[in-house]
Amino acid sequence: MAILTSKASNIPYPIQYDELHKEAVLQKHFDTASYLSTTHTTRNTMRYFLYFAYDGTNYHGWQVQPNAVTVQLRLEEAMQTLLRVPTPVTGAGRTDTGVNARTMVAHFDTETPLPDPAVFADRLNRLLPPDIAVHRCVPVTDTAHARFDATSRTYKYYAIDHKSPFAERYAWRYRGTLDFDAMNQAAEALYRYTDFTSFSKLHTDVKTNNCRVTYAHWEQEGEGYTFTITADRFLRNMVRAIVGTLVEVGRHKITLDEFCAIIEGRDRGLAGTSMPGKALFLHDVTYPEELFL
């Protein structure tokens, strides 16, 4: 399902596509064998970055896990069908259950260079379900890594204060009023810190909870407010925990000083609740130019 934004609203909404049964797609649109049997005869491993979007509503997050349908699972299934060999993909990050992505990046390797990455992206799209859409496929250096080479990631969180049959699927609806000026003052305080243990999911496998936040701001857009945050990396559940704590500032339940004390306390139990994942979008991921061929 492709994700677009209405001109009159800051809230993303889905464009519906007709369902195509996978076998019918293969029969009608593909000749995989002829696609792979090209003039490229030398076996030369190539790495590619895949840029794609997804609606996370029906998925248990990005990463493959037992007994669950995930975005990575569906993508790797489609890759194997198209390339006819198991093809693992490595994502730029791990979004949680229900979280969406306007731009996710993943890398994968092929033993034979793709004849035309644009054609590959188009054919992969035809195999994927309607709620996953590939934007483009680009060749990169052999050592380029979608996760470790990312220089920044940007997330957006959408909030509305009224009932909307179109927006509520991808936005958090709040009751009463929020002091967004106070929330932005607290958001600016994030620049002064690097240890965000208080906003991290417990018992994760990361070696450090240090991140460098370079932008964090609430802005009125269309019919609601959008929180945009950019950092070099994010911890599990970090953005939703930050938003939940900023909401407590906006409701005057805690002061700016108390918000800072929560960060300095390095204790997840001090921070606010984790906000619903449906309103969170991975918006962009950036990389050094030298990675691209």
Positions of PLM-derived features:
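Extreme N-terminal basic, low-complexity initiation segments
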Residues: 1-13
